[in-house]
Amino acid sequence: MYPKKTHWTAEITPNLHGTEVVVAGWVWELRDIGRVKFVVVRDREGFVQVTLKAGKTPDHLFKVFAELSREDVVVIKGIVEASKIAKSGVEIFPSEIWILNKAKPLPIDIWSETPDLATRLKWRSVDLKRPRNLVVFTVASAMLRSIREVLYGEGFVEVFTPKIIVTSTEGGAELFPVMYFERVAYLSQSPQLYKEQLTASLERVFEIGPAYRAEKHNTDYHLNEFISVDAEAAFMDYNDIMDILEKIMRRLASTVSEYAPKLEEVGIKALMELSNIPRVDYDEAVDRLRQLGYAVNWGDDFTVEMQKALMKYYGPVYFIVNFPASLRPFYTKRKDGEKSESYDLIINGIEVASGATRIHKRDELEEEMKKRGLDPRLFESHLSVFDYGMPPHAGFGLGFNRLVTALLGLDNVRHATLYPRDRYRVEP
């Protein structure tokens, strides 16, 4: 029986010189230079060198070494010694090695050249062993924790809303149908209507969960299943919500900076510093784009290329505010007639979040629905809530996969998604 792991590889430092430890992980590299042999062991946190030296290491371990292959699962017990030669400044001299499972030759190379994305995603579970991926998803987990902590600190309650629904949240047709016993239902594209309803009871709510959109996109920034961070708060407007988003973004920059050495080691140049985020009126953004030579009309939405171009004036992180009402969902509160109390949060040219002040009076909401060709009767279960004390409220929806992509400077949202689901991919 093998012993339990006592340390992550990253915890094996020169300070542990002379200490017996147990590490567990996968064989990353094997080197044989005669009387000295090396096993580099990988776990989630990094690497550690295990050194076998004739006259110092038990003889039977050289036979075990001969059986080892890359990616074999191992447990190793040994004594830590400080080293001026080992890359990490430390090595382990083993007293015992257990091979828990043998690995066949891998179908893709995770050590040197990176295969094309389609091949990597085909073998995603193997590809996730790559050190760069380990860092990306470890940082992503820390980012989620930080988002939760900020929202809890602002008095929000975490909720979970249905993902099987009977009508569209946005009033469109881009929904995935599912058979729900004897009737057709749909996968939820957003918790928007539920979180609005919850402001009439819980006041401030947020949800982190999957969302589904049957959009036939095939771009670097679109997925059909993604993790959405949604928040809604009573007695707030869009400026209040942007203030909260600013707090989240500053906290995230700080969180990411804690992983600076690991990110730099795998070649990721992340956004780690953030000052106040400028709030750019839509009209000003249109004028700036025209100055840059873009043929953009008032009422047009902005492309990723345009949003990247605006970084020249506003830096890598900025809000665009007060969009034309025609570009926003039906539940968005209007501002001065044709505009709206709305915003997008742009990071490195990518729209990562959108939000607005919402309409909180039933008659105004029904009127907005009719203007857009929607039948209020299809939304009766939602509209009825507005009859019993719906407060003024505002909120945001944030695409977490896009957020990770933008903050870490990745070139494709699939790199920030464990098992991506897009128009052409539904496995593994």
From Swiss-Prot:
InterPro entries from the UniProt entry: Aa-tRNA-synt_II (IPR004364), aa-tRNA-synth_II (IPR006195), aa-tRNA-synth_II/BPL/LPL (IPR045864), Asp-tRNA_synthase_2 (IPR004523), Asp/Asn-tRNA-synth_IIb (IPR002312), NA-bd_OB-fold (IPR012340), NA-bd_OB_tRNA (IPR004365)
Subcellular location: Cytoplasm
EC number, UniProt record: 6.1.1.12
GO biological process: aspartyl-tRNA aminoacylation
Gene Ontology cellular-component annotations: aminoacyl-tRNA synthetase multienzyme complex; cytosol
The protein's required cofactors: Mg(2+)
Annotated catalysed reactions: tRNA(Asp) + L-aspartate + ATP = L-aspartyl-tRNA(Asp) + AMP + diphosphate
UniProt keywords, alphabetically: Aminoacyl-tRNA synthetase, ATP-binding, Cytoplasm, Ligase, Magnesium, Metal-binding, Nucleotide-binding, Protein biosynthesis
Class of the enzyme per the UniProt entry, highest EC level: ligase
Binding residues for ATP: R213, A214, E215, E351, G399, F400, N401, R402
Source taxon at top rank: Archaea
Amino-acid positions noted as binding Mg(2+) 2 in the UniProt annotation, renumbered to this chain: E351, S354
Binding site for L-aspartate: E170, R213, S354, R358
Annotated cofactor note: Binds 3 Mg(2+) cations per subunit. The strongest magnesium site (Mg1) is bound to the beta- and gamma-phosphates of ATP and four water molecules complete its coordination sphere.
GO molecular-function term, one example from the UniProt record: ATP binding
Site description Important for tRNA discrimination, residues in chain: K87
Binding site for Mg(2+) 3: E351
SUPFAM superfamilies: Class II aaRS and biotin synthetases, Nucleic acid-binding proteins
Residue ranges, annotated region (Aspartate): 192-195
Subunit structure: Homodimer.
PANTHER family: ASPARTATE--TRNA LIGASE, CYTOPLASMIC, ASPARTYL-TRNA SYNTHETASE
Similarity-based family: Belongs to the class-II aminoacyl-tRNA synthetase family. Type 2 subfamily.
Function: Catalyzes the attachment of L-aspartate to tRNA(Asp) in a two-step reaction: L-aspartate is first activated by ATP to form Asp-AMP and then transferred to the acceptor end of tRNA(Asp).
Full protein name: Aspartate--tRNA(Asp) ligase
Gene: aspS
